[in-house]
Amino acid sequence: GGQRQRIGIARVLASNPGLIIADEPVSALDVSIQAQVLNLLNKLKRELGLTILFIAHDLSVVKYFSDYIGVMNKGRLVEQGTPEEIYSHPIHPYTKALLSAIPVPDPAYEKWRGYVTYDPSVHDYSVEKPSMHHVEGRHYVYLSDSEMVKYIK
C-alpha cells in the first residue's frame, strides 16, 4: 500500500526540488496508508525544507497536513489562512459550507446536525466588486466591502 506514492516521491526528490506539487497524493489509499504517506511527506518537508503545494478534497487530511490553507471555488481563491484560522473562524460562505460537510465520528451528532448550503446568488458582484480582505494574522477572505462588514460581525 502506498508504494506508487513512495516511488513518485523518490523520483521527485532525485531532482532536489524546492517545491513539490502533490495533487490528491493520498486520496486512493486506506486511512492507515494515508497516515504513513502523510507522515513521510511531513518528515521530508521538515528535514529538507521543502514547500509542498498539497491539493486535496479531504478536509481532515488538509487540516492535518497543512501549515497554510487556500480554499478555492471555481478557480478563485476565496479564503486563505492557517488551519486554526480557517477551521475555527471560517468567513466565506463557501468555506463554511465545505467545513460543515466534514463527517464527525459521532453517530448521534451526525444524525441531527445541520449542514450549511452554499448559494452563490448571495453575492451581487455586478454592483460591488469583491476583493481580498485581511481578517487578522494570516487570514484573508475574498468578499465585497459590504459582505465583509456583514460576515465579520
Question: Where on the chain are the PLM-derived regions?
Answer:
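A short, surface-exposed alpha-helical micro-motif characterized by mixed small hydrophobic
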Residues: 62-64
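Hydrophobic anchor residue at the start of the ABC signature
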Residues: 9, 21, 37
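A short, proline-enriched helix->beta-strand linker immediately N-terminal to the Walker B motif
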Residues: 14-18
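Charged, flexible cofactor/metal-binding loops and thiol motifs
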Residues: 82-152
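Short, glycine/charged-rich "phosphate-handling" switch motifs in NTP-dependent
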Residues: 68, 80
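Helical segment within the ABC ATPase nucleotide-binding domain
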Residues: 35-48, 60
